[in-house]
């Protein structure tokens, strides 16, 4: 089953206001209308000047279906919190696969056929060796037949400070196409949260990246 990599937003916690209140804890957390009006400027100043700890109070939470190669890119961000579908603990019965959209048609077909063969060997091996090795070890060993384009599901969350780090590295022209697409999907989902709770945080990131801060 060929599928595109996809991202769902499971939830979020916090907002620009929560981040601002965290910063104001050092003086007074009491919110007035006057202080609320200062939140956009405060958020921008905090990010511009490198006071990033308050941004850890905002959290975004995603469900990601992606190829194993992209999953490895997610794993490299140790500042995220991640749990994923495991071929060690379960048989991957659905045989979900990703085929690069920019492949020539000939190589799309070849990769799909190669993946079908590998998936068939995975299931055959698992069934054949579990009597000798036991179900647990059989699942561990048979998964070596799975290819890099096999898809698994991951539950991943970031605080807003670590999410920025992820976007800087993965929503980049230097990143691999697939993980860049995942990063862009994540950012778009955060931008589309009802009420735009992180509006000024995202704007502060953009300003600093473009050197628009005075």
Segments and roles (model prediction):
Residues 1-214:
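Family-specific signature for flavin-dependent thymidylate synthase
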């Amino acid at each position: 089953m060929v599928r595109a990599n996809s991202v769902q937003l499971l939830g979020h916690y916090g907002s620009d206001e929560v981040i601002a209140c965290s910063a104001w804890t050092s003086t007074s957390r009491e919110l007035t209308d006057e202080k609320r009006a200062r939140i956009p400027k405060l958020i921008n100043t905090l990010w511009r000047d490198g006071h990033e700890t308050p941004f850890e109070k905002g959290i975004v939470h995603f469900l990601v279906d992606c190829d194993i190669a992209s999953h490895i890119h997610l794993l490299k961000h140790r500042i995220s919190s991640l749990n994923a579908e495991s071929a060690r603990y379960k048989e991957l019965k659905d045989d979900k696969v990703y085929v690069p959209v920019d492949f020539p048609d000939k190589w799309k077909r070849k990769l799909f056929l190669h993946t079908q063969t590998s998936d068939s060997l995975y299931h055959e091996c698992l069934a054949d060796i579990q009597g000798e090795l036991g179900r647990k070890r059989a699942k561990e060993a048979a998964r070596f037949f799975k290819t890099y384009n096999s898809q698994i599901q991951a539950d991943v969350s970031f605080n807003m400070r670590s999410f920025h780090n992820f976007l800087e590295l993965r929503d980049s022209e230097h990143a691999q196409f697939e993980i860049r697409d995942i990063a862009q999907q994540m950012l778009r989902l955060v931008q589309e949260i009802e009420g735009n709770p992180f509006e000024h945080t995202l704007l502060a990131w953009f300003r600093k990246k473009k050197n628009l801060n005075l």
